[in-house]
């Protein structure tokens, strides 16, 4: 691994998702390219960027959105990482085997190599967040990967509410933890609970840093 620079520039991608997965992929790739050209060295997509958040219902047809890792989306981000010389963390709906699906993220180094995959461990099952219908909890533990710009770990969305997830990732040597997220509020809760929940989230993240 090359000497890690003292300062790292992050590119964090966020966008409204179109019903067309191909359009979302094109948007994310273009946004990542723009971020790289603006100086980003590590780029992270939002959680499940390639589709609208489908876990609001339990619908079997949504499994068609999943793809293997590596697959077409992984390959597209590998090519971008290699061309732009950036590290990329991209969140994907993974089809691991027949009947076995994960909410995953691929970790791609600046030379385009696929370093590994993180699979979301903590899976919510609340009104409008029926993720247990779709995702099997990850079975790889909490890990970290050496990249061109430091040793990074990955958590996904609800994982970041659990202190031990960040602690174990840090114990694996992570200098930076990235958390692709599609977090939100139930519409009936946002006005009454939104500010308090946001403050609680900030407190949790500060605890992770400590």
Give the ranges of each region predicted by the language model.
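Glycine-rich anion/phosphate-binding loops
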Residues: 22-29, 70-71
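Short polar catalytic/cofactor-binding loops
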Residues: 14-19
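CN hydrolase (nitrilase-like) catalytic-core segments centered on the catalytic cysteine
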Residues: 66-89, 157-210
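Short glycine/proline- and charge-enriched loop/turn segments
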Residues: 56-64, 126-127, 186-193
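Beta-strand-turn-beta hairpins that frame and shape the catalytic cleft
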Residues: 2-10, 144-153, 176
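Catalytic-core segment of enzymes that process non-peptidic bonds
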Residues: 64-154, 205-210
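Active-site beta-strand/loop signature of hydrolases that rely on acidic residues for catalysis
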Residues: 10, 24, 32-61, 81, ...
């Amino acid at each position: 691994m090359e000497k890690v620079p003292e300062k790292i520039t992050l590119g964090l991608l966020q966008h409204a998702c179109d019903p067309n997965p191909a359009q979302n992929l094109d948007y994310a790739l273009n946004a990542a390219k723009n971020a790289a050209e603006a100086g980003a060295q590590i780029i992270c997509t939002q959680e499940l960027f390639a589709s609208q958040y489908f876990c609001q219902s339990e619908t079997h047809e949504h499994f068609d959105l999943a793809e293997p890792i590596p697959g077409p989306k992984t390959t597209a981000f590998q090519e971008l990482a290699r061309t732009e010389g950036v590290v990329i963390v991209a969140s994907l709906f993974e089809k691991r085997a027949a009947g076995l699906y994960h909410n995953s993220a691929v970790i791609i180094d600046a030379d385009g190599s696929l370093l590994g995959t993180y699979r979301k461990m903590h899976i919510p099952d609340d009104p409008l967040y029926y993720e247990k219908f779709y995702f099997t909890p990850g079975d790889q533990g909490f890990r970290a990967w050496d990249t061109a710009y430091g040793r990074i770990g990955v958590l996904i969305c609800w994982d970041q509410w659990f202190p031990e997830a960040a602690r174990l990732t840090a114990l694996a040597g992570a200098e930076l933890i990235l958390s692709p997220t599609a977090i939100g509020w139930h519409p009936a809760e946002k006005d009454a609970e939104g500010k308090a929940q946001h403050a609680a989230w900030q407190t949790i993240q500060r605890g992770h840093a400590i």
